Amino acid sequence: MIPIIVLIGRTNVGKSTLFNVLTKTRDALVANYPGITRDRQYGYCKLQSNKKIILIDTAGLDIKLNEIEKQAQAQTLIAIKEAHLILFLVNARDGLMPQEYEISKNIRKYQKKTILVINKIDGINEASKINEFYSLGFEKIQKISASHNQGINTLINRYLIPWISEKFKKKITENLYKDTELKKIAIKVAFIGRPNVGKSTLINGILKEERMITSNTPGTTLDSISTPIKYNYENYTLIDTAGASKKKKKINDFQRFSIIKTLQTIEKSNVILLIIDASLQTCHQDLSLADFIIHSGKGIVVVVNKCDLFNSVELKKIKELIKSKLKFLYFSKIHFISALYKKGIFQLFKSIKESYEDSKRKISTSTLIKTMHIAIKKHQPPIIKGRRIKLKYAHLGSSNPPKIIIHGNQVKYLSLPYKRYLINFFYKTLKIKGTPIQIQFKDNENPYVKNKN
């Protein structure tokens, strides 16, 4: 069993900053706005002597306003139940707030070991402001500044390592290697799309639990949230992301960070599910996202959600329209589903696995050369300045995505339509599905040209 530690506190006390410092990542979204963290965010923290813990970042416990914030608090309470240890964060600059008496009272109901962490101590000269936190009645207290990395080593060495050694003993090292192995082979699947297309609802449907906060309000998900799952003996990591909305004249910093994190998630993932709302017209934003995914070289599966809103005749028209607009994604599977009613959602895994395996496929040089020669025989390259462009041989430059390098003479003069013809021919002949192929052309240099100069 791996120790689980949860970060609890009011909004804007520095929970996400401490999460990023301890996990040595930037997985948690950090901004100077209250209520940015909503869903539970999990991360690994590696300590000395191969000790490893799971850290959970949570939403602030002091907001009880709208439906989204109520769901965020429910997620936080689930995290407290899962955890073995609570790090209760408070803000030294704000001083002791009335809500913190209420939070400490609620924490004690769970009878979990708790460490009070007084954050943002940098620049605080008034000892009275810090001392008033002792009235909360917690035995173990640590003063830190997460943003300046002050007191973090003391927190780890004085409290976390001794607690793990005492409670979990030998099991930690054993689990470290098991989890590292699982993590290596997990297929990372990112759920990408415009706001309110049903990304979080789809993940909840697959997990068969309310793991992600959902609502009819666009922009409910602000951060990229990863969740591990095992399906048909395969390990997957499902990553929910913030919706990539249309360009606006005014956007907040955290909205800008959310979009950046979504694009970074695409780069880090193996396969992308591009979610499209069947009730809305396929717009420029959907096409831009598809184009970005193709250029990032990631496997792509198109998912058209909310098909339950239409009858068979209407759905047939929608299918034809979407297929027409996305014809440049001819190598990808298109699934028509209803995430809300869980129709067609588990068929996605077959396309995800197919896309992942084809992106890592090793293709022999002889197969590529043979395929290239058949393509040339069917349709020869154009003649430039009285000489025909010659394609001599091809080989695999890299995989994930497959990158084919073709060598020849005057290849820089190849037209875009002929390059497209070659890519399409490789797709059909090699039967590659769900992943983009990249082709690079290299001119053979004439060794005598340099000697003449």
UniProtKB/Swiss-Prot annotation:
Biological process annotations from GO: ribosome biogenesis
An MF annotation (GO) of this entry: GTP binding
Transmembrane segments: none
KH-like domain sequence ranges: 361-445
Organism superkingdom: Bacteria
Domain EngA-type G span(s) in chain numbering: 3-167, 187-360
Keyword Nucleotide-binding: yes
Entry-linked InterPro entries: G_ENGA, GTP-bd, GTPase_Der, KH_dom-like, KH_dom-like_a/b, P-loop_NTPase, Small_GTP-bd
Keywords in alphabetical order: GTP-binding, Nucleotide-binding, Repeat, Ribosome biogenesis
Residues at which GTP 2 binds: 193-200, 240-244, 305-308
PROSITE patterns the record matches: G_ENGA
Residues binding GTP 1: 9-16, 57-61, 119-122
Role according to the record: GTPase that plays an essential role in the late steps of ribosome biogenesis.
Assembly and interaction partners: Associates with the 50S ribosomal subunit.
Sequence similarity: Belongs to the TRAFAC class TrmE-Era-EngA-EngB-Septin-like GTPase superfamily. EngA (Der) GTPase family.
Protein name in UniProt: GTPase Der
Protein source organism: Buchnera aphidicola subsp. Acyrthosiphon pisum (strain APS)
Gene encoding the protein: der
